[in-house]
Amino acid sequence: ECADKVRDEIKEKNGNDILLFYNDYSSFQTEKRDHICELIKEINSEEKLCDGMGMQSYIGGWADNDADRQNGCFSPYDLSNHKEAVEKYSALGVEVHITECAIRNFYNTESALKKHKEFYVKFVKQIEELNSGSTPKITNFSIWGLTDLPSTVTDSNYSYTMNGPYAGLYTSLNESFTYTKKDVYYAILEELNN
């Protein structure tokens, strides 16, 4: 209610067109998604106060150790959950923003980096498919954790578990922090240009 009043006052005073979003993490997980849908329905029951849904999308790999974390990465289940969540939020008549997309990866092996790249491309293709109709379902896509973090954080660090040390589109080959684009960067760019 307070955010709605502030929005209306700013619109009236400055003529700005402001949209209010509900933004939350793990919003593609089934149970949480369903609760959020009910919340948005309730908020918008009398008049449209919530204009959009912000999906913080930290995908894959929650566990206590790297081996289990890595086993939780690149799951087709996460892709289908994310797609279903976007469709459900969009069906409520609100814009959908992917506000923080981090496809987690905890290993710097050739195999893990290849799977990371392939999963990211599948995720971007899914966004393109969701937006292929006359009205886009996703109006913003922001990638979170652009760079790898292997030498700057330990496995007990929040950033390590949130993003994964090798989840970036760029990597530093040495301690000079000179960043190089990874194969995943070029694969995403190629998909977006097709």
Q: Model regions: which residues?
A:
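Glycoside hydrolase catalytic-domain groove-lining segments
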Residues: 1-23, 29-108, 124-134, 138
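Aromatic-rich peripheral "rim/lid" segments of glycoside hydrolase catalytic domains that contact
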Residues: 74-88, 92-97, 105-194
